[in-house]
Amino acid sequence: MMMTKINFSLWIISVVLTVPLNTLSGQHGRIPTPAKEGMVVSNHYLASQAGMQVLKNGGNAVDAAITTAFALAVTLPSAGNIGGGGFMVYHGADGTSTTFNFREKAPQAASERMYLDANGQIKDNSNHEGPLSVGVPGTVAGLWMAHGKLGSKPWADLVKPSVELAEKGFPSTWDMQDILSYFQKQEQPVFAAAKKAFLKNGTDLYTPGELWKQPDLAASLKRIQLQGRDGFYKGETAALLEAYMKKHGGIITAKDLANYEAEELKPIIGNYRGFDIIGMPPPSSGGVAIMEMLNMLEKYDLRKMGPNSAEYLHVLTEVMRRAFADRAQYIGDPNFNKDMPIEKLISKDYAELLAASIQMDKASKSDSAAFGSLYL
């Protein structure tokens, strides 16, 4: 199946065990909803329902997140898939916190110029489309690691709902029709497998409300259900991925898959107005950027400004500009960048310096080419 490059938010799952158990089934809009015992939030109501059922059956937050993630592999083909990667931040009822990094990794055969032609120009959008654009997937390994360390229910039980969703099918939606129309327009051979999977008879879009089944995905998920991480990184699935790559000019090998490892990392921890903030560390920029922004915002009386007032939005924009400038300048993969000044970036003293550079009567520039030199 053709895969496209997955960016920062491959999938987002929120499992909150603080707030009767319910699932909001509306697909559109943002509607605040309370719950007293538990809440599962995802991009698709069927995935959220699957995760909520895990909680009702006595599973914990990590169990629910795993089930929700695999269900999204079925219901959210544009992002929530097993062919990408992601991050997980965990904070337990006992106060312990940890994070898991399972982002995609470059194959061993990757090189600096693999996307460029003889003139140094990107070839055929190959950095965004096609087999060269993807890294070695990490989702299955990451969820497997999180389950081994923090899960409570049997792995097979947690993956089962996604297998059933793929086998039995679920109603297509207008959103899905819009997303999958992309494949209908593609004529290159590399898209043949995707068209078979995502289009009716390989040619037509499923109409909203029509049942969509994914037997090949169900088979892949079944191997993961029964064999754990080896059901993806070794054996039949790995062989199928390697064969596809070879056929279409990709470079991911069975060895790349077998060698993939997720990692558990110490979280970014800070404090905002008395609240502990726990975030994802690099290679994610999220934890550092959020903490940097909050530290700057702490210097302002936001309540007095009023929500979405001109003054409030100005401060918020300026704070974000500074955090994203530092994000571009400093944050990378710690496996290749050992000297990131993380403690400085999330310190209160540094936030004081940045906040002092904000002028209330003047907007600063948003120039990515000059990031890192604009403010201090």
Where do the model's predicted regions map?
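Bacterial N-terminal signal peptides that target proteins for export
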Residues: 1-12
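Bacterial N-terminal signal peptides
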Residues: 10-22
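Noncatalytic scaffold domains of N-terminal-nucleophile
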Residues: 27-49, 53, 61-62, 66-234, ...
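Short, charged, low-complexity patches
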Residues: 136, 286, 290, 312-313
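Internal maturation/activation junctions in enzymes
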Residues: 299-376
